A protein has these predicted regions:
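Short beta-strand elements in bilobed, periplasmic/extracellular small-molecule ligand-binding domains
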Residues: 102-119, 178-181, 230-250
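Solvent-exposed, acidic/polar segments of extracytosolic/periplasmic ligand-binding ectodomains
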Residues: 58, 371-428
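Bacterial N-terminal signal peptides that target proteins for export
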Residues: 6, 28-41
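Short, well-structured alpha-helical segments in soluble
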Residues: 117-136, 251-264
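Extracytoplasmic ligand/sensor domains, especially the bilobed periplasmic-binding protein
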Residues: 132-239, 293-295, 304
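Extracellular/periplasmic ligand-binding modules, especially the Venus flytrap/periplasmic-binding
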Residues: 92, 308-366
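N-terminal signal peptide c-region/cleavage motif recognized by signal peptidases
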Residues: 49-51
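Signal peptide-proximal N-terminal region
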Residues: 71-73, 79-114
Length: 428
């Protein structure tokens, strides 16, 4: 019978200490083994040292605006569904940490630079500073006017830099106002509306009472909802304007029971409220017992902190540990922008920025977004293809595209504007 020490020696490849030799093998001198271990350790340490010396630093800038109304403390405290609850820098920093191992193997160190514009006029100086730092990857955490200004100025100022929109759902930025180097990780308004319409059609809740606010953003939401409703066979039984006001003469415009009581045909109440303040008062306050969707109740979102598949819990926990708050859709969009930069750097470590852009926008590079399939950017408008979660405050109850929704090429292109519908004419 083979002595236990010999079995251990065979498994570990280290000769046994003391006792009779195992089989016919000659014992290896201890000093020789010490020398081998010492050589291996030095080689390993030398490899780390070489990697550290040879690492190429790549900086990704996160550009935000001081005093951005989206981040007013009162708004963030209320945490309206579909609205940001913190700056994009948190998501990008987590992406750099998550990608460190593969980047290190490629000899790259990803550095995140936080750039806060004092006002819109500060963009020119910020771009000059970024040019001096040789930055060519930018994540934009900006309102629409400042994002458009950045997208127009960045190519010339930063040598063709790639700009990621990680926070705005404006369809125009993917359409007539698109740019060749502008990629979108946050889903478009049309994508969110299509996801919601797919779910309503699947549940056969086809008759919707629409409550629409007075803001320009509410009108844009209505445009997207009506487009999606026509696409998936939904019908608006009536559209009622709402208004939050202290004027006693207009009090009825903010009364949910009055707004929902006269229409008896609807199967669901769709709230189109880009601000979010009115929408939060609608669930469980309708005259008839009906589900509420849109800006409250059942909400279409790119991420939910209680997503339980595809590594979602691990991602949400890592983010919450670092940022001290739950991960929202805006945080996920910032994180996936950072991951996209890391992925293209690993796949094409020596490629110039123009080649990286082509590889991302309609090219072979795809990113793991912890939502199931690997995600890629559409060639025609730079939008990231992605599943959309249908969720409420306590979890995810559906994922679009839903089963049964078909597309001749890519089922995720059923969300938002397909190539034939796109008004974007800018290509890399």
């Amino acid at each position: 019978m083979t002595p236990p020490r010999c079995l251990l020696a065979a498994r570990s490849r280290i000769p046994p200490q003391g006792g009779a030799p195992c089989g016919l093998a000659k014992p290896v001198p201890r000093e020789l083994w010490k020398g081998l271990w010492r050589s291996a350790a030095l080689a390993l340490l030398g490899g780390f040292a070489f990697s550290a010396i040879a690492a190429t630093k790549v900086t990704i800038a996160v550009v935000s605006l001081d005093g951005d109304p989206r981040y007013a403390p009162r708004r963030m405290e209320k945490a309206y569904p579909g609205h940001p609850t913190g700056r994009a820098i948190d998501g990008v920093q987590l992406a750099a940490e998550d990608s460190a191992f593969e980047l290190d193997a490629a000899g790259i160190e990803l550095v995140v630079k936080d750039v806060v514009l004092p006002n819109a006029a500060g963009l020119a100086k910020a771009l000059a500073d970024l040019k001096a730092a040789k930055v060519q990857h930018v994540v934009a955490d900006l309102p629409a006017p400042e994002l458009r200004a950045l997208a127009q100025a960045a190519p010339a100022a930063l040598g063709g830099a790639i700009v990621f929109n990680a926070g705005l759902d404006d369809d125009a930025l993917r359409g007539a106002q698109c740019a060749a180097h502008l990629l979108h990780t946050y889903p478009s308004r049309a994508m969110l509306a299509d996801a919601l319409a797919q779910y309503l059609a699947a549940r056969n809740w086809r008759k919707a009472l629409v409550l629409q606010g007075p803001l320009p953003g509410d009108a844009l939401q209505a445009e997207a909802f009506n487009r999606a409703a026509k696409r998936y066979g939904l019908k608006a039984t009536s559209t009622k304007p709402f208004k939050l006001t202290g004027d006693p003469r207009e009090r009825d415009l903010g009364n949910v029971r009055l707004l929902t009581g006269s229409d008896r045909e609807h199967e669901v109440v769709a709230v189109l409220d880009s601000d979010g303040e009115f929408a939060r008062t609608v669930p469980y306050a309708t005259q008839l017992p009906r589900p509420v969707v849109g800006a409250a109740g059942l909400v279409a979102t790119p991420w939910h902190p209680l997503w339980e598949r595809n590594g979602g819990p691990q991602l949400s926990r890592r983010f919450a540990k670092d940022a001290k708050r739950p991960m929202t859709g805006h945080d996920w969009a910032a994180w996936i922008a950072g991951r996209a930069v890391a992925t293209v750097l690993v796949d094409l470590p020596k490629a110039p920025i123009a080649q990286q852009l082509k590889a991302l926008r309609g090219g072979p590079v795809a990113v793991d977004g912890f939502k199931g399939p690997r995600l890629s950017f559409r060639a025609w408008d730079g939008q990231l293809r992605q599943p959309i979660f249908l969720s409420h405050v306590d979890g995810v109850i559906g994922v679009a595209p839903l089963d049964g929704v078909l597309h001749p090429k890519e089922v995720m292109d059923t969300l938002g504007f397909d190539e034939a519908e796109s008004a974007c004419r800018q290509r890399p």
